[in-house]
Swiss-Prot record:
UniProt similarity note: Belongs to the glucagon family.
GO molecular function: glucagon receptor binding; hormone activity
Gene: gcg
Gene3D superfamilies associated with the record: 6.10.250.590
Further comment: X's in the sequence were included by homology with other species sequences.
Organism of this sequence: Aquarana catesbeiana
Protein's name in the database: Pro-glucagon
Compartments reported by the entry: Secreted
Residues spanning the membrane: none
Top-level taxon of origin: Eukaryota
Length: 103
């Protein structure tokens, strides 16, 4: 039960972090004039999709590079890694499924 609570809390943290990153991206785009001009012609959605695709790809590559940490607390680390593996796989598959094919 505590593992599920931890996983849920961690998932909420990741969602919060993504939201913070997105807000920061919006603020940076607004300062550079990217959003106000692009919103009317529909490119805002495309810009957001590109941002999210790049972010998902970067997070997945970072996850692959870091690999599995080794700790003395093997059981907790193992369970935590399994939860992260599942979450990363789900996010990667969602990204692949939801990415429009560019011609």
């Amino acid at each position: 039960h505590s593992q599920g609570t931890f996983t849920s809390d961690y998932s909420k943290y990741l969602d919060s972090r993504r939201a913070q990153d997105f807000v920061q991206w919006l603020m940076n785009s607004k300062r550079s004039g990217g959003i106000s001009x692009x919103h009317a012609d529909g490119t805002f959605t495309s810009d957001m999709s590109s941002y999210l695709e790049e972010k998902a790809a970067k997070e997945f590559v970072d996850w692959l590079i870091k690999g599995r940490p080794k700790h003395a607390d093997g059981s907790f680390t193992s369970d935590f890694n399994k939860a992260l593996d599942i979450k990363a796989a789900q996010e990667f598959l969602d990204w692949i499924i939801n990415t429009p094919v560019k011609e």
